[in-house]
């Protein structure tokens, strides 16, 4: 695979997800925000999208960085983007940026980081054959 194609396949997905998050953040607030299940769904979405974003950044960075640095960079990018996303929402009519959303986003990124570390830190089991 050529280097430009490889870079696009690695960096394209996290950048595309960030663009999607930005687009959703630019939408004005709707009126049913006080319905409990809509509130819950949005918080689960915050957690999930940033968990996915962290995993995608890890995937993009793992060949260039050691495991711990790739995981930390993924979390760092996610938290920084969560902060800027909430700041962006303060500029949109009917939207407010909140620190608790940043914390939910960070929790999603940290959950993904924990799963990634757990997955890549486990020793590979070698199947023993008995002859």
PLM-predicted stretches and their roles:
Residues 1-59:
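"…centered on the first transmembrane helix and the immediately adjacent amphipathic helix/loop
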Residues 14-23, 71-90:
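Small-polar-interrupted transmembrane alpha-helices in polytopic inner-membrane proteins
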Residues 118-128:
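Membrane-interface capping segments at transmembrane-helix boundaries
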Residues 31-39, 83-106:
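Interfacial helix-loop-helix junctions of multi-pass membrane proteins
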Residues 23-28, 62-67, 76:
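Short, motif-level signal for alpha-helix interfacial/capping segments enriched in acidic residues
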Residues 49-64, 107-120:
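Membrane-interfacial alpha-helical segments at the cytosolic side of multi-pass membrane proteins
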Residues 6-9, 31, 65-73, 98-99:
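Membrane-helix interface segments
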Residues 15, 40, 47, 56, ...:
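Residue-level signature of the transmembrane alpha-helical core
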């Amino acid at each position: 695979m050529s280097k430009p194609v490889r870079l696009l396949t690695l960096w394209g997905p996290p950048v595309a997800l960030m663009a999607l998050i930005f687009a959703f953040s630019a939408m004005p607030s709707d009126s049913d925000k006080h319905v409990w299940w809509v509130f819950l769904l949005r918080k689960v979405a915050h957690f999930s999208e940033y968990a996915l974003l962290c995993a995608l950044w890890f995937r993009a960075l793992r060949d260039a960085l050691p495991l711990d640095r790739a995981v930390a960079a993924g979390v760092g990018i996610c938290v920084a983007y969560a902060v800027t996303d909430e700041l962006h929402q303060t500029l949109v009519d009917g939207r407010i940026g909140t620190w608790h959303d940043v914390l939910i986003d960070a929790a999603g990124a940290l959950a993904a980081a924990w799963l990634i570390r757990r997955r890549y830190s486990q020793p590979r089991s070698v199947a023993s054959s008995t002859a």
